[in-house]
Amino acid sequence: MKLHSKQKSLRVFLAVELSLDLRRKVVELQRQLRESLPMVNWVRPESIHLTLKFLGYVDASMVELVLTAIEPIRTSQLPLTLQVQGLGVFPHLRRPRILWIGCTGDISALLNLVSRIEGALEPLGFPPEVKPYFPHLTLARIKHDNSQVGGVLTHSGLLEQPQDLGMLHVDRITLFRSEVSQFGAEYTALRTVPLNEPGPHI
């Protein structure tokens, strides 16, 4: 998608998309969890991703600068593999707001990738995140009855189950646009760049 500077500001973030196989497993996990947690707002499977860096609202002309800034990372960063497993919540079980499934595996390489992205974008005016990066896929958002949801999660044993969904291959980075509608956030891929490949993709 070619962007023009006349467009209004865009709400964007960098993330890793899920494979079709992993997305199907997420759908099945959400289906199973719905039986115990009918009161939460489930994220649409096509919207689930691994966020690397949230940029917020930027002028459309800034998008190409962002892609140029991460070009050295794209050409030198080796792909890595994560294991998607283990349920958890933010901020805590007493009143959870987010239900997620976590990532294990090559976390040190992932943290290094995120750190490199932070460093590349800071000169453009994007400050590093204050909170430590915690890799996860958001499965559901809890807006009402969150203390009840916390009780269900505590007594059901769901958080103790491994819930291993398989591998997430981090071999490309996608710049997404986020638009909020009455149906929730809708994400549009603006550009996807493969890792460790020579040549311009901007």
Feature roles, as predicted:
Residues 1-202:
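Histidine-dependent nucleotide/RNA phosphoesterase domain, centered on the 2H-phosphoesterase fold
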